[in-house]
Swiss-Prot record:
Gene for this chain: rps16
Protein name: Small ribosomal subunit protein bS16c
Disulfide bridges in this chain: none
Pfam families, alphabetized: Ribosomal_S16
Domain of life: Eukaryota
HAMAP family attached to this UniProt entry: Ribosomal_bS16
PROSITE patterns the record matches: RIBOSOMAL_S16
Gene Ontology MF, one: structural constituent of ribosome
Keywords in alphabetical order: Chloroplast, Plastid, Ribonucleoprotein, Ribosomal protein
Gene Ontology BP term (one): mitochondrial translation
Gene3D superfamilies attached to this UniProt entry: 3.30.1320.10
Organism lineage: Eukaryota, Viridiplantae, Streptophyta, Embryophyta, Tracheophyta
Subcellular location as annotated: Plastid, Chloroplast
């Protein structure tokens, strides 16, 4: 199963996160299938590759709670109301 989740990058005390599609059995820093964006909580910046995210969601990838919140804040789910289990 594939998940969209955060992968930590950056320096100590200055973390930035890549949003990646990754196999659920992989470590947080493990090899990802594809990078689909990044999130910088310090500068509050987000960059999303929308076609890639749509591709993985259509194939059945599940976003983690944090990635779902980032996508919702970026108004990725405009009309669709989605619940996570």
């Amino acid at each position: 199963m594939v998940k969209l989740r955060l992968k930590r990058c950056g320096r100590k005390q200055q973390a930035i996160y890549r949003i990646v599609a990754i196999d659920v059995r992989s470590r947080r820093e493990g090899r990802d299938l594809r990078k689909v964006g990044f999130y910088d909580p310090i500068k509050n910046q987000t960059c999303l590759n929308v076609p890639a995210i749509l591709y993985f969601l259509e194939k059945g990838a599940q976003p983690t709670r944090t990635v779902y919140d980032i996508l919702r804040k970026a108004e990725f789910f405009k009309d669709k109301e989605r619940t996570l289990s």
